[in-house]
């Protein structure tokens, strides 16, 4: 069984990706980057989600000699011309401070009417092999931004995005419900046939 590295140390994301890939029937040994603590984090210097996902996947594949999967994802707000976008995790200045990011974004759009609060989560999922082979696929989840957070599930901006056709935020959905419709779920399900094609 081929070992496949997930290029993240984010425990929430590792759990989510393992569930998505297992549900898609991917028969590979999946481990997070935390299994390789000597490998430094990769600077996300790309200007798109796809570029950042590829940077991370290639760095891990090169460092471990194993196939690596990475994603880059974020929230794109229509009225902010797609921001925070690739800066979603560090929108408030410090990387990974979910509450500060939520608070800042909600303050920035506080006076925006409901009909102009459209947004989507975007995800680029990349597979990189040690020989340099690469593939990228993308997924989106469209919705509307709530005026206040709701729900305790998920992570990041999940408490404020209400998916189209839903009455609940992503943070109010069960993990299974969220994975079925999420940007990350769509991207990684699209990556499964690519993994099968390249790794057998």
UniProtKB/Swiss-Prot annotation:
Reactions listed under catalytic activity: XTP + H2O = XMP + diphosphate + H(+); dITP + H2O = dIMP + diphosphate + H(+); ITP + H2O = IMP + diphosphate + H(+)
Cofactor binding notes: Binds 1 Mg(2+) ion per subunit.
GO cellular component: cytoplasm; cytosol
A UniProt-annotated Pfam family: Ham1p_like
EC number: 3.6.1.66
Residues annotated as binding Mg(2+): 72
Similarity-based family: Belongs to the HAM1 NTPase family.
PANTHER family linked to this entry: INOSINE TRIPHOSPHATE PYROPHOSPHATASE (PTHR11067:SF9), INOSINE TRIPHOSPHATE PYROPHOSPHATASE/HAM1 PROTEIN (PTHR11067)
Protein name: dITP/XTP pyrophosphatase
Organism: Streptomyces coelicolor (strain ATCC BAA-471 / A3(2) / M145)
């Amino acid at each position: 069984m081929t070992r496949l590295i997930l290029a993240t140390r984010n425990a929430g994301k590792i759990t989510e990706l393992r569930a998505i890939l297992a549900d898609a029937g991917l028969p590979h040994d999946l481990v997070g980057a935390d299994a390789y603590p000597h490998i430094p984090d990769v600077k996300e210097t790309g200007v798109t989600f796809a570029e950042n996902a590829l940077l991370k996947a290639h760095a891990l594949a090169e460092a471990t000699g194993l196939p690596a999967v990475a994603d880059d994802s974020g929230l794109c707000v229509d009225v902010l011309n797609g921001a925070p976008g690739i800066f979603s995790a560090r929108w408030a200045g410090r990387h990974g401070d979910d509450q500060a990011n939520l608070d800042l974004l909600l303050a920035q759009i506080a006076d925006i009417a409901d009909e102009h609060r459209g947004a989507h989560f975007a995800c680029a999922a990349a597979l990189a092999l040690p020989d340099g082979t690469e593939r990228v696929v993308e997924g989106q989840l469209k919705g509307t931004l709530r005026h206040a957070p709701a729900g305790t599930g998920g992570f990041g901006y999940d408490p404020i995005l209400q998916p189209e056709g839903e009455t609940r935020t992503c943070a109010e959905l069960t993990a299974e419900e969220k994975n079925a419709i999420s940007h990350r779920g769509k991207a990684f399900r699209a990556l499964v046939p690519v993994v099968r094609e390249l790794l057998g």
